A protein has these predicted regions:
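Membrane-proximal intracellular helices of multi-pass ion channels
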Residues: 1-480
Length: 480
């Protein structure tokens, strides 16, 4: 394994991050706030980290699979490390552990925060927080692949590693188109969202920040009360639509606009996903109305729809204190936080594709018990699922729930109540953000012991890297 090659590619990612830090510093300079020097110094340090390997290490004609995993996972981890720099230099609530937690939460698009007063941050730092969401939404490596043409033909190997296996199955295009498709949709959707939010009453700065977070399904807001600060049905419905679109498979979005056969409207996964959202919204809305949580059915359904879409897409924006909702509503929201959005999107979580496939596997096994000699084929969105794919999904979901269980046990060991411990573990591994109980939708993670913040950051990284990518990185020396 050639570590010099790995350093060159990771260095490319660092150059991208330094550019975003420089933009954030420019915002602080224009707004004349105290975030300028922390961001400028961070940009220079990150630039140096990225420039040296790019200058002194020659390009490689090819990279191995092992090197590819090291590049992708190493880029994510180092991005989280340099992402700490502006927070640490700024100080305030950002201790070493808090800065690490906030950085990991941003890049993994979890959106969980240790800040007790978000609005006290300078505008430049607020923009940097949202930028970490936006960069992490499509993948830190993907940005480097788009921006730096010097990475050459190895782009394809890296983009394949960055995507989950289910996502790759659903991209029915030439591999070299994947990066362009992803980022064209991503950037276009961000611009459209910004304009819509501005027209709806947000300031330009807030509109840009919320657009970046919404399209990344990240959830960082510039307000302590999140989207609830605006108390605007129009803003809420705009964000509901954008969060939903962002949680759909980007390949299917592209197919829909290019009028190909495999599009959103013909996708079995999207139909099931939409049905789950509508069903959950109606059930929770009815629960809120009949429990007199809200004064009328329309407000109940609006609040229900926003929180349902926010959690199932793993965005984590909030307009209500869900801790005050009925136990029935809370249970449904936790289930949605486990299922989450579609593969090939910016959403985290187990993915509705996997859950649906697992349901088909169970159905096939039951049929196999009734008809032992039958040959039962399992298809998902028209694609025949091989035994290897089925076994991978089963193993993934098993590992996913084991990690939630271990996270819950560990959190309970350090004094968290069961609801807070379980929901925070679900929120971390699923990159959802808010949980329930002590870490509810309008609360934060400031009071967590440092050890649990570190545990949470590890779970966030594992979730964002689809678990196995992180595990393979840890045991990469054992590969043959």
């Amino acid at each position: 394994m050639r570590f010099n090659v790995i350093l060159r590619y990771v260095g490319a990612v660092m150059l991208c991050l330094s550019a975003f830090m420089a933009v954030s510093a420019g915002i602080s300079l224009v707004s004349n706030d105290a975030g300028f020097y922390p961001l400028l110094l961070s940009a220079l340090l990150t630039l140096l980290l990225g420039a040296f390997p790019m200058i002194f290490v020659s390009k490689a004609d090819s990279i191995t699979t092992k090197e590819g995993f090291m590049i992708v996972v190493g880029s994510w981890v180092l991005s989280c490390v340099v992402g700490m720099f502006p927070y640490l230099i700024w100080g305030g609530e950002f201790t070493l552990v808090n800065a690490w937690f906030e950085s990991v939460s941003g890049f993994t698009t979890t959106g969980a925060s240790i800040l007790t007063d978000i609005e006290a941050l300078p505008q430049g730092l607020l923009f940097w927080r949202s930028a970490t969401n936006w960069i992490g939404g499509v993948g830190v490596v993907m940005f480097a692949l788009l921006i730096l043409p010097s990475l050459g033909t190895n782009k394809m190997a890296l983009s394949g590693i960055e995507l989950s296996s289910l996502a790759k199955d659903n991209y029915r295009y030439r591999t070299q188109m994947v990066v362009k498709i992803l980022l064209t949709i991503y950037i276009g959707l961000t611009i459209i969202t910004t304009l819509l939010l501005k027209v709806s009453g947000m300031r330009w700065f807030d509109a840009v920040n919320h657009a970046m977070s919404a399209c990344a399904t990240g959830g960082f807001s510039t307000k302590n009360a999140s989207v609830g600060f605006y108390d605007s049905p129009l803003i809420e419905w705009i964000l509901i639509v954008i969060m939903f679109i962002s949680s759909l498979h980007y390949g299917l979005i592209y197919s829909t606009f290019t009028r190909k056969a495999n599009n959103i409207f013909r996708s079995e996964v999207v139909r099931v996903y939409a049905a789950i959202i509508v069903g959950a919204t109606l059930l929770i809305g009815a629960s809120l109305y009949f429990s007199d949580t809200y004064e009328n059915i329309f407000t109940s359904l609006r609040q229900s729809a926003f929180q349902v879409v926010s959690l199932i897409t793993t965005t984590g924006f909030a307009t209500a204190n869900t801790n005050l909702w009925t136990p029935f509503a809370i249970v449904i929201l936790i289930i949605l936080s486990i299922i989450c959005g579609c593969a090939g999107s910016t959403s985290g979580g187990a993915k509705v594709d996997r859950v649906l496939l697992y349901g088909k596997v169970l159905k096939a096994r039951l049929r196999g018990q009734q008809h032992p000699n039958a040959i039962i084929r399992i298809r998902l969105d028209g694609i025949l699922q091989e035994d290897r794919q089925v076994n991978t999904v089963t193993l993934f979901l098993t590992t996913y729930f084991v990690l939630i269980l271990l996270g819950t046990l560990s959190s309970a060991l350090f004094g968290m109540d069961l609801l807070s411990a379980f929901s925070s573990s679900v929120a971390f591994i699923g990159n959802v953000g808010p949980g329930f109980g002590a870490v509810g939708s309008l609360d934060n993670y400031a009071e967590l012991p440092s050890i649990l913040k570190i545990q949470g950051s590890i779970l966030m990284l594992m979730g964002r890297l689809e678990i196995f990518g992180f595990i393979q990185f840890l045991f990469i020396r054992m590969w043959r």
